[in-house]
Amino acid sequence: MSNDFLICPKCQSKNIQNINARKWFCPDCGFDLYNNVAAAVGLIIEDTDGTLIFEIRAKEPRKGFLALPGGFCDPDESAEQAAFRECREETGVEPSSIKYIASFPNTYIYKEIKYKTCDLFFSAEFTKTEKTIIEQMQGEESEVTGFKSIRINSIDDIDNLPLAFESAHKALKVWFSQNHK
C-alpha cells in the first residue's frame, strides 16, 4: 500500500498530487500536507558484565528480531523524555542518566503504511545494584517477548546481529567506535 491519498481530505477532489514524496497538494483547493518524519528513540544498554541488552520484538514490524529498547516520541515530549519513558515501559527499569549517541533516518512499516522516522539513539546508565540490569528487567508483553545479552567485540559482531532496524546497526557502530578505541 502506498501512502498516497486518492482524494483530497479537504475538498474531496481526485486531483490531489504527491510532490516528490515530500507533500500532498490539491490544485483545486490549495490543500498542503507535508510528509514529516516521526521522531523515535532507542537505548543502548550495557550490562554490568559488559554485554549489551537487546529486546526480542513481540510484534510486527520484524517480530522476533532483536531491537534496542525504544519507540516513538509522544506529542509535546522531548527525545530525552521519550527515552526514559520507553525504557521504563518496555523493560521495567529506568536509567539514571542517558547520553546522546547519534541519529539516523529509518523506515518503519506498520500495517502496510511506511512511516519515515528520525531515530535518535542514547546510551543508558543505571544505578549499580546487586543484580545485573537484565535480571531486573520485566518486558512489556505487548512489545517484548524477552531479552538477550550479547557481547560485542567487533564491528563484524554488530553486522551479524539479527536487528529489526538498520538504524540500530548504524547507532551501535557509532557507539562501538566511541567506546572501543
Regions found by a protein language model. Name each.
Residues M1-L43:
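Acidic, metal-coordinating catalytic segment for phosphate/diphosphate chemistry
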Residues C73-K99, F104-A164:
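Unchanged
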Residues D28, R57, G70, S149-S154:
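Active-site donor-binding loop signature of nucleotide-sugar glycosyltransferases
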Residues A164-K181:
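Charged phosphate-binding loop/patch that engages nucleotide di/tri-phosphates or the phosphate backbone
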Residues A21, N36-A40, P61-K63, L68, ...:
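Short connector loops at helix/strand junctions that flank enzyme active sites
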Residues D47-E89:
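Conserved Nudix-box catalytic region and its N-terminal flanking loop in Nudix hydrolases
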Residues D28-L52, P69-F72, S123:
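Conserved N-terminal beta-strand and adjoining loop/helix that marks the start
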Residues G42, I53-I56, E135-Q136:
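Beta-strand scaffold of nucleotide-dependent catalytic cores
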